[in-house]
UniProtKB/Swiss-Prot annotation:
Molecular-function annotations in GO: RNA binding
Gene name linked to the record: nusB
InterPro entries (UniProt xref): NusB-like_sf, NusB_fam, NusB_RsmB_TIM44
Function description: Involved in transcription antitermination. Required for transcription of ribosomal RNA (rRNA) genes. Binds specifically to the boxA antiterminator sequence of the ribosomal RNA (rrn) operons.
HAMAP family: NusB (MF_00073)
Protein family membership: Belongs to the NusB family.
Stretches assigned to coiled coil: none
Lineage: superkingdom: Bacteria
Keyword Transcription set for record: yes
NCBIfam families noted in UniProt: nusB, PRK00202.1-1
Swiss-Prot/TrEMBL keywords: RNA-binding, Transcription, Transcription antitermination, Transcription regulation
Listed PANTHER family: ANTITERMINATION NUSB DOMAIN-CONTAINING PROTEIN, N UTILIZATION SUBSTANCE PROTEIN B-RELATED
Protein name stated in the entry: Transcription antitermination protein NusB
Taxonomic source organism: Streptococcus pyogenes serotype M6 (strain ATCC BAA-946 / MGAS10394)
GO terms, biological process: DNA-templated transcription termination; transcription antitermination
Length: 150
């Protein structure tokens, strides 16, 4: 097995981003999740099927199931003249993932979820996009900090 990914929450968020990106390009949810989790794990003929971590599946399934709601929330926080369609697929996927965790994962403090998605954004996007994602999600967190979890 390679050491490029562990099962830390940060690594699983990154895997969730990869799976969600693949789903946007036509992949099936479970297949995309399995590929994102296992593509760099060395397996032999006798290897067992990799069991997907619940955290990873919860993120991917949750974002997929709440996509329309998340897109509406993102749209309401975009500056005048911007639309969801104008955003890159990478940025939309990162925003959906970050917003979903902030809104629905009670066990993850909002600021932790925000900082974690920014770290993923720095890896898969550029500095400008990471700042944009930080700004939009920070605005969401600051507007209704006690009402964000539902």
């Amino acid at each position: 097995m390679t050491n490029s990914f562990q099962n830390s929450r940060r690594d699983l968020r990154e895997r969730a981003f990869q799976a969600l990106f693949n789903i946007e390009t036509g992949a099936e949810l479970l297949a995309a999740s399995q590929f994102a989790y296992g593509y760099d794990k060395v397996t032999g003929e006798d290897a067992q099927v990799l069991e997907l971590p619940i955290f990873l599946l919860s993120l991917v399934t949750g974002v997929n199931n709440h996509k329309e709601e998340l897109d509406n929330l993102i749209s309401t926080h975009l500056k005048k003249g911007w639309s969801l369609e104008r955003l890159t697929l990478t940025d939309k996927t990162l925003l959906r993932l970050g917003l979903f965790e902030i809104k629905y994962f009670d066990e993850t403090p909002d600021r932790v979820a925000l900082n974690e998605i920014i770290e993923v954004a720095k890896k898969y996007s550029d500095e400008t996009s990471a700042k944009f994602i930080n700004g939009l999600l920070s605005q969401y967190v600051s507007e209704a900090p006690s009402a964000n979890k539902s």
